[in-house]
Amino acid sequence: MKERALQLVRESAPEARRNVLREYLQSHVLFSLQAGRAFEQLAFVGGTALRFLYALRRYSEDLDFSLERPAGYRFQRFLDRTERDLMNAGFDVTMHPCEADPMHSAFIRFPGLLHEAELSPHRTAKLSIKIEIDTRPPSGAGLEATVIDQHFLLALQHHDLPSLMAGKLHALLTRPYAKGRDIYDLLWYLSRPEPVSPNVLLLRNALAQTDWAGAQVTALSWRAVIERRLHEIDSTSAADDVGPFLESPEERALLTRKNVLAALRQGRK
């Protein structure tokens, strides 16, 4: 399995190699979680879910989940299974978990792998993947199950697209700093050939849970709320954040306030 990861790196364009390696490892972690029956309790969410399930054209760093069925949930059990599977596949692995309330997280680190893949001159360089599980997610999400072939055959429970969009809008409205990844993902949602609208119930519950002080969001007002937020963001610096993760680096030039506002307003017609 490790040799397959290194082969993928060798076959990739130089600028994509670190992302390709990370994505293979993400797939391996998802496969281990699936084998441990994690998706009976967890739903896959966030940017990596968008990439794996809906072919988002940007790479992502973290694996994010929502705990939908808490009965019998034990975070450490999933980590133990994942660590064992990765080590059996030939990877050196260290786990660094944190079970703070309400977010359970763990950094899975792969010491020496970047050097072995000729992506770093330093033997001690570490590639890491962060797993994060929201153990008290807001209510109202729609759930779906999808089977995909992403290096491994994966059967994933996940939030549906309107609920994933609600999660993205919540991040955009509540982060203390702007992430270019949020802007890119918003533009992706707004420019889809098949229109998608956010799960407003989930968005409202998420905003209430994080004590958001803005006006109540509705199916009619969410675009205006997002438009106000976009005027607060420095789109140039935000675009710098997402550049290294884009499949097509030239898309970075599209991440302007003008373009995002145009897509946002177009949906009102």
Question: Where are the regions that the model predicts?
Answer:
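Glycine-rich beta-strand-to-loop/alpha-helix junction loops that act as flexible
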Residues: V45-T48
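Structured mid-to-C-terminal alpha-helical surface segments
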Residues: M1-A43, L53, R69-K269
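Glycine-rich active-site/cofactor-binding loop and its immediate structural neighborhood
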Residues: S66
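Short glycine-biased active-site loop of nucleotidyltransferases that positions the nucleotide triphosphate
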Residues: R51-Y59
